[in-house]
Structure formats: C-alpha cells, structure tokens
C-alpha cells in the first residue's frame, strides 16, 4: 500500500498541449490565482508534503500505467492546476513579447499621436495667452491715443482762441470811415483851439468848449490806443513759433488717425505667423524624436522642408518693416505739404499786413501835412481879422492892406490841400497794377511832380517867414494907441523891417510876393 502512494502521477504531452490550445489565458484571473492559490484537500496536502513530484522522461511514460482509484485521480487533477496556470502565464508573456517585437511601428504611431495631442493642447493654451496679451495692449494703446488726442484738441482750441483775438485786433487796426471822419473833426477842433489860444481874448472858456476839450482828450486817448494796437499788428516771434507748433500737432493728429485706420497686420499674415509658430513647435518635437530614434528618410525630408519654412517668417518680418516705413513716409509727405500750404497762407497775410502798415504810415504823413496847412489857414484868418481893424498908421495900413493877395493865397492853399488829401477810396484800396505801370512808363511826369513838391516846400518856408512878420505886426497892433490932444502933432514912426531885410516900398514888396507864388498847374 505504501508503494502505491509513492508512485508519481504524470500526464501525457498530447493532453497538456490540447489544454494549452483550447483554454485562453485570462490576464486578470492569472494575477488573482498567483496571489491566492487554490487550497488542496487534506489527504493530497499530506501526500505532497511527504513525496516530491518528479517529471518522468518520455521513455518512462510509455511503460507507466495509470492507477485507478478515486482519491489518486483527485490528487492528480489538483496538482496539475497550478502547473497549468504557470505554463499559461509564461506562454502569454512570450506571446506579448513576440507581438511587441513584431510591431515597433504601431508603438511609434501611438507615441506620436499622444505627443501630437499634447502639442496641440500646449499650442492652444499659448494662443489664448497671446490673444489676451494682444487685446490688453490694444486697449492700453487706444486709451493712450485718446488721452493724446484730448490734449492736442485742448491746445488747438486755446491757440485758435488766440488767433481769433489777433484777427479782432487786426480788424480794429483797419480804420473805418467813421474813425477817419473823427480824425478830421479832431483836427478841425485842434485848429480852433490853437486859433483861440492865439487870440487870447477870452480868458475863460464857456462850458461847451470845456466839454469839447474833454471830448478831444478822450479821442486823443483812443488814437494812442489805436497806435499801440498798430504796433502789436506785427505778429511777434513767440506767436509765430506757436503757429508752427500748432501745425506740427495737427500733422501728428492726422498721422495718428491714419495709424488707427490701418490694422497692424492683415488677417492673412496673422494666420501665416500662427502656422509658422506651429511648424516651429513641430520642428522642435521632431528634433527631440530624432535624438531618441533613428528617423526614416521621409521624416528627414520633412525636417528639411520645415527648416526651409523657418526662413519665411524672417522674410515676412522684413516686409512688414518696409510697409510700416512706407506708411510713415507717406504721413510725413502729407504733413510737409500741409506745412507748405500754411506757410504760403501766412506769407500772404504778412504781405497784406505790410501793405496796411505802409498805408497807415502814408496816412500819418498826410495827416501831418493837413495839420500844417490848417495852421497856415488859421494864421491867414488871423491876418484877415487884423485887416478889418481900424488903421491908425498909414504905413501899417499899406503893409496890411493885401486882401486880394491873401485871397489868392487861400485859394492856392485850398488847391494844395485838395491835391494832398487822397480820397478814401485810394487810401482803402491799393493802386491798380496797370496804373502803376503807366506811371513807371512816364518818368518825366514823376520828375515834374518832384520839382513841384520842392517848390511847395519853398512856399511853406516863405509862409513861415510871413507868419513871423504877422506875429510882430499883431504885437505892435495890440499896443495902446493914444489919441493926440487938440493942438498936438502926432509923430508917425514907420515900422522897422525885420533883421536881414531892407526897407522896400509897398509896390516892390507886392511884386516880390507875386513872384513867389508859382503859376497854376493845369
């Protein structure tokens, strides 16, 4: 009985192969079975503990016979189960290794797909971040541009107000017809005042004349104010610099508006840049893979294409820089054209102002001549009054009785005033260029006019001498005349001549005065 229990139990190789082929090895169940082996019944455990299991050779398998008996068969089946499981696990592992060795390309494809997914996710995140940064920069730039625009608009409004003020001053400087009439009225009143001062008969002026004097003083103040404004008519250098600065700021505003209208980059170029960034990322990824694995020839060709495409973004950046430079040059050209136009306008204004200043100077000269003529007219009126006084002395009467000559002098003076006083239309309007050309074509007429003016200057000097003589005569006439008592003889004292003149008869003096006046010009 003891020998029966010690006999080894073996299986034929055909049965073991059939079991391996028919039963597939489950992966999960193998691990569980390895962790938790199936327990054996107690009689089998004792037999296994006492006797080792021996694997017989092929020759012994032929001579061995199966022992019939229920307990032995159960023990054999229970012993075969862990062995079969170990064999199945080994076979499965070998099968997996064989599949891995046969399919390296599938593994590369799977790894490549995983890496592509990771790259796409990373690129999408970077794209979102770049979009956010671009939006923030655009918002900041728009805010800065708005602030600059507001500042420039405020400066332009202030300087426009200054320009309007200057234009108002220029309008005030152009004397209207009413102010010219006031000037003439003032000159007449000044002549009356001088005439009253010369007479000196009225020690106290009436209330009307006092009011007239105050009114004259006010008008003189207005004249001084107008002259002061005329001096300010020429625009100072500071205002000219402000005007140039204004023009530059307006050009900058237009340039900023143009920049706002033009997008930074068109959509096509933005898409190209993004595509190039993706290709660069792919290049880096391919280089990393190239270091890890030996790449086939197709991937090497792709690498070369990608390297060629790397040079394209540099070319695009150069084109973008050239476009920006061209846009800046166009803005500068427009700004220069605007500056030239504004300078031409300012030159025209300056020429117009210079013409006005020359006209004002000419008017002032004519006003001075008018004042001088009015003074002479007042002196002649005084002489007429003196002619109407009683003649106490015969010699004084002969010298003072020249009404006809004085009337001729008055008429001649009136003609001179009419010639000197330019009409208002000629003062307000410049001469027509055709008239100026005609005047230039006849230099003889201009020489005649110059000679005539020199004669008038000589006449004015003679009138001043006559004025001195008349003042002396007036002083002699104002001396009290004593009537002679009856029986007395009055000594008639002749009037002594002035220094430098000999005593001439009345007829010679009349001839001398007639010679001094030139013949009338047609």
Swiss-Prot record:
Q: Which family does it belong to?
A: Belongs to the involucrin family.
Question: What is the protein's known function?
Answer: Part of the insoluble cornified cell envelope (CE) of stratified squamous epithelia.
Biased composition, class Basic and acidic residues, residue ranges: 92-126, 182-198, 214-231, 252-264, 274-290, 305-323, 391-401, 409-418, 431-465
- The protein's name in its UniProt record: Involucrin
Q: Which GO terms describe its cellular component?
A: cornified envelope; cytoplasm
Tissue spec: Keratinocytes of epidermis and other stratified squamous epithelia.
Please name the GO terms of the biological process aspect recorded for this protein, alphabetically.
Answer: keratinization; keratinocyte differentiation; peptide cross-linking; response to UV-B
The principal location of this protein is cytoplasm
Location(s), subcellular: Cytoplasm
Q: Where is the composition biased (Low complexity)?
A: 76-91, 169-181, 375-389, 466-479
| Polar residues: bias regions | 1-15
Record note on quaternary structure: Directly or indirectly cross-linked to cornifelin (CNFN).
Could you tell me which InterPro entries the record lists for this protein? Involucrin_CS (IPR019743), Involucrin_N (IPR019571), Involucrin_rpt (IPR000354)
Which controlled-vocabulary keywords does the entry list? Cytoplasm, Keratinization, Repeat
Q: Where is this region: Disordered?
A: 1-126, 159-329, 366-496
């Amino acid at each position: 009985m003891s020998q029966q229990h010690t006999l080894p139990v073996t299986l034929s190789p055909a049965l073991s192969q059939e079991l391996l082929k028919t039963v597939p090895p489950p992966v999960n169940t193998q691990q569980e079975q390895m962790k938790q082996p199936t327990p054996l019944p107690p009689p089998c455990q004792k037999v296994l503990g006492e006797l080792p299991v021996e694997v017989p050779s092929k020759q012994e398998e032929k001579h061995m016979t199966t022992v019939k008996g229920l307990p032995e068969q159960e023990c054999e089946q229970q012993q075969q189960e862990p062995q079969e499981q170990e064999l199945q696990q080994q076979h499965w592992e070998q099968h997996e290794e064989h599949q891995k060795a046969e399919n390296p390309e599938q593994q590369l494809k799977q790894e490549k797909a995983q890496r592509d997914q990771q790259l796409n996710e990373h690129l999408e995140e970077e794209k979102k971040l770049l979009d956010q940064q671009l939006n923030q920069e655009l918002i900041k730039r728009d805010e800065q541009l708005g602030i600059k625009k507001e500042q420039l608009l405020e400066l332009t409004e202030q300087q426009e107000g200054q320009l309007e003020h200057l234009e108002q001053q220029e309008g005030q400087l152009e004397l209207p017809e009413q102010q010219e009439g006031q000037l003439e009225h003032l000159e007449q009143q000044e002549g009356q005042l001088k005439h009253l001062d010369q007479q000196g008969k009225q020690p106290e002026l009436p209330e009307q004349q006092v009011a007239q004097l105050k009114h004259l003083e006010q008008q003189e103040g207005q004249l001084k104010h107008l002259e002061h404004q005329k001096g300010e008519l020429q625009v100072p250098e500071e205002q000219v610099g402000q005007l140039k600065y204004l023009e530059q700021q307006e050009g900058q505003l237009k340039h900023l508006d143009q920049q706002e209208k033009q997008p930074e980059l068109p959509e096509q170029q933005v898409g190209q840049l993004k595509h190039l960034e993706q290709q660069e990322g792919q290049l880096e990824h391919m280089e990393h893979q190239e270091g890890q694995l030996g790449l086939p020839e197709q991937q090497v060709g792709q690498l070369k294409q990608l390297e060629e495409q790397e040079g394209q973004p540099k070319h695009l950046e150069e084109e973008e820089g050239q476009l920006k430079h061209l846009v800046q040059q166009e803005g500068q050209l427009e700004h220069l054209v605007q500056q030239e136009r504004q300078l031409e306008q300012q030159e025209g204004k300056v020429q117009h102002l210079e013409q006005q200043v020359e006209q004002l100077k000419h008017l002032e000269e004519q006003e001075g001549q008018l004042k001088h003529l009015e003074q002479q007219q007042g002196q002649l009126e005084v002489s007429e009054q003196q002619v109407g006084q009683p003649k106490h002395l015969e010699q004084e009467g002969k010298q003072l009785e020249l009404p006809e000559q004085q009337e001729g002098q008055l008429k001649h003076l009136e003609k001179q005033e009419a010639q000197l006083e330019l009409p208002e239309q000629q003062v307000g309007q410049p001469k027509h260029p055709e008239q100026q050309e005609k005047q230039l074509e006849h230099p003889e007429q201009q020489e005649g006019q110059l000679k005539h003016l020199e004669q008038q200057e000589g006449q004015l000097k003679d009138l001043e001498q006559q004025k001195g003589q008349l003042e002396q005569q007036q002083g002699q006439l104002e001396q009290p005349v004593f009537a002679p008592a009856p029986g007395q003889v009055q000594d008639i004292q002749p009037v002594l001549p002035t220094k430098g003149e000999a005593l001439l008869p009345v007829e010679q003096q009349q001839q001398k005065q007639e010679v001094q006046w030139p013949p009338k010009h047609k």
